[in-house]
């Protein structure tokens, strides 16, 4: 026996008589060539090749639907409950969003001066920070009337920043409306109701903004860069640097990237659940329980993708979704700081917003 080669007894040589019949010559030759390649390979190389074969087999199995190994009955029940909660609490046409405040508008679409004055004196430094935060991103709002008329609000051309104050009451109304929907969404979920009230409050304080952004993404039109909320539509006006500069804005960049994934409704609601059941939110007591719940929703999302998405085209979709949720956590923290700075100089938050963002009077 040649040193370094596997023992002959360890290899089952093909018997040429086994391959009698049509095409037997070609099959026998291929089989013998395969054995010859194995004979000249070291033990380590043979094992490496076997591992490669096993890996390719697993990949082929992953490329097909899981069938019987798909979503468990428990996972299907979880997803059904989330879908029902979403349907009951998310007004996708915004038909129930009424009696909201609007900034000064005009039907001609001309620019309308902001209604508030820029703070001066000792508040100048604070206002400078607010202007740096927000003035490069000017929100445009359009309202379609039932009679077909259109009212436009466009920010001023100058950079005084006063137009931000003009829009704040409306944004507070929209945010409060969306926040109520998220709270009701959580209350429908049985696992959420089973948690202590203190943990429910802590989870909602941490996740409400994030869940709102996930819901807003479902009405985001990536072709026009517009959030289409029934009769209302919102967009960000191009800054001096143009559209490319606009894409550097974290929230807008997030919405474009998430929309590009073309998620199913089930994937959106599972993302909402994963965000809601985050065990590391401040004030959460039963962290291990919440952590286990989050893991169950994450596993359900992973299995759902494997069952309903063609592989390997979407083999990394689950990882991309989890990365988007991490990015959303960062945006949430930045948004909270900006909101607190504006609230400090120009109080506008509704009582519910004050509760969720722990804003105290004075």
Specify the residue positions occupied by each region the protein language model found.
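Intrinsically disordered, low-complexity regulatory regions enriched in Ser/Pro/Thr/Gln
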Residues: 1-362
């Amino acid at each position: 026996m040649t040193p370094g080669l596997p023992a002959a007894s360890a290899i089952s040589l093909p018997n040429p008589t086994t391959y009698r019949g049509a095409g037997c010559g070609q099959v026998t030759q291929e089989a013998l060539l395969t054995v010859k390649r194995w004979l000249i390979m070291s033990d380590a190389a043979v094992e490496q090749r076997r591992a490669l074969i096993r890996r390719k087999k697993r990949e082929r199995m992953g490329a097909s639907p899981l069938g019987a190994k798909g979503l468990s009955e428990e996972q299907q029940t979880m997803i059904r409950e989330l879908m029902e909660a979403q349907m009951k609490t998310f007004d996708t046409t915004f038909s129930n969003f009424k009696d909201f405040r609007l900034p000064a508008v005009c039907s001609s679409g001309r620019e309308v001066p902001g209604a508030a004055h820029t703070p001066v004196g000792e508040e100048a430094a604070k206002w400078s920070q607010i202007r740096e935060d927000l003035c490069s991103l000017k929100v445009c709002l359009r309202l379609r009337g039932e009679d077909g008329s259109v009212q436009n609000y466009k920010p001023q051309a100058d950079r005084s920043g006063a137009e931000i104050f003009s829009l704040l009451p409306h944004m507070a109304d929209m945010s409060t409306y969306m926040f109520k929907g998220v709270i009701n969404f959580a209350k429908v979920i049985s696992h959420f109701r089973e948690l202590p009230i203190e943990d429910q409050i802590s989870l909602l304080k941490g996740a409400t903004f994030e869940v709102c952004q996930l819901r807003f993404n479902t009405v985001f039109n990536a072709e026009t860069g517009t959030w289409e909320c029934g009769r209302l539509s919102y967009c960000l006006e191009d800054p001096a640097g143009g559209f490319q500069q606009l894409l550097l804005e974290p929230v807008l960049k997030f919405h474009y990237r998430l929309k590009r994934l073309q998620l199913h409704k089930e994937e959106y609601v599972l993302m909402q659940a994963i965000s809601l059941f985050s065990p590391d939110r401040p004030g959460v007591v039963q962290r291990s329980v919440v952590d286990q719940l989050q893991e169950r929703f994450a596993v359900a999302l992973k299995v759902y993708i494997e069952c309903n998405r063609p592989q390997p085209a979407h083999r990394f979709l689950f990882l991309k979704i989890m990365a988007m949720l991490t990015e959303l956590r960062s945006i949430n923290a930045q948004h909270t700081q900006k909101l607190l700075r504006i609230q400090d100089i120009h109080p506008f938050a509704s009582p519910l917003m004050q509760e969720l963002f722990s804003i105290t009077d004075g």
